[in-house]
Amino acid sequence: MTSKIQNPNLAALSAAGVSVWLDDLSRDRLQSGNLQKLIDTKSVVGVTTNPSIFQKAFANGHAYDAQIAELAKRGANVDVTVRTVTTDDVRHACDVLACEWEASHGKDGRVSIEVDPRLAHDTDKTIAQAVELWRIVDHPNLFIKIPATKAGLPAITAVLAEGISVNVTLIFSVQRHREVIDAYLAGIEKAAEAGRDLSKIVSVASFFVSRVDTEIDKRLEKLGSEQALALRGQAGVANARLAYAAYQKAFEGGQRYQTLMARGAQVQRPLWASTGVKNPDYADTLYVTELVAPNTVNTMPETTIDAVADHGVIRGDTISGTTLSSQKVFDSLVAVGVDLIDVFAVLEHEGVQKFVKSWNELLKETQEQLDSVAK
């Protein structure tokens, strides 16, 4: 029986209004009881997955071999095999997190599964697959992850209108975050027109943090001036803080949301993603301790959860009151010559391509396993 004594640092983070989610899932993690242990001792109340996470899970060890062999004997093709295996893991994780879902009235206890990343620029196919995944997993604490591409935005609205909960992923800019909020509100308005229970439709907006620093720092180093170099390591946090200000404007003061709230609609919480620190010169808890505010989620790899548990200093709300200083960071970036429009375009393109590459590798490796069973 796992002890249910929560780590004090992570408990403090939760008490400050930040839901701690694990950015990882594998069958080994489920079967070993590790996910349950993280729930019981590290305040974890949700799970996010993506194509890269599943590709690594399949590649490491043999936890999936027996199921893939069984599917091969039944004549399943590679797409069906991958979808069956991944949705089984997600369904199992939904069961593990059911208590957290109930205790939070549906806000937490969520498990995210992403639509095929190859559909990132196809609205209709994204909608169709989102509906299919929702049907296959068939758990109310599921999130369907849809990327915040231009084609993804109308898909988000359409899927929410069907009463399906959505995790919007690959958001890099505050402007795109505003468009995501609009897509969410439009979807909830359509759901209201259809007579759906708005309190049951939940969404988060996954705003990527460390990748912004990685891309902008690279450009600052290329520029090389003293002013440029002094700005390294500031953009990721400042960008996320400005995204939180956009959230506050829409949901804490926006009339459009107030009308929907009266009918039971929930806010679309910002979720800080890509919070594992990639630069060893920066504190390994940077994207956690500097992004504390009510009604947020931080999804972290286990190494980051462990770092916060060990030495993360939670100082309460570190976002409120930072809008002007955060905007100043971006004004300074423009002043030294950083092309922010290009930065965010590159990040979105690379984000989609990384997931496509992982998905293709997953399909290739699974096809090889299917072929070996057939021989």
Swiss-Prot record:
Q: Name one GO molecular function term.
A: transaldolase activity
Encoding gene, per UniProt annotation: tal
* InterPro entries per the UniProt record, alphabetical: Aldolase_TIM, TAL/FSA, Transaldolase_2, Transaldolase_AS
Q: Which organism is it from?
A: Mycobacterium leprae (strain TN)
Cytoplasm in keyword set? yes
**Which terms does the UniProt entry file under GO BP?**
carbohydrate metabolic process; pentose-phosphate shunt
| Active site positions, chain numbering | K145
Sorted alphabetically, the keyword list is: Cytoplasm, Pentose shunt, Schiff base, Transferase
The question of whether Metal-binding is a record keyword is answered with no
For this protein, the record's NCBIfam families field holds: PRK03343.1, tal_mycobact
Instruction: State the name under which the record lists this protein.
Output: Transaldolase
Q: Which family does it belong to?
A: Belongs to the transaldolase family. Type 2 subfamily.
What is this enzyme's catalytic activity, as reactions?
A: D-sedoheptulose 7-phosphate + D-glyceraldehyde 3-phosphate = D-erythrose 4-phosphate + beta-D-fructose 6-phosphate
Query: Which locations, inside or outside the cell, does it occupy?
Result: Cytoplasm
| GO CC annotations on file | cytoplasm
This entry's Enzyme Commission designation comes to 2.2.1.2
- What is the recorded function of this protein according to its Swiss-Prot or TrEMBL entry? Transaldolase is important for the balance of metabolites in the pentose-phosphate pathway.
Which pathway is recorded for this entry? Carbohydrate degradation; pentose phosphate pathway; D-glyceraldehyde 3-phosphate and beta-D-fructose 6-phosphate from D-ribose 5-phosphate and D-xylulose 5-phosphate (non-oxidative stage): step 2/3
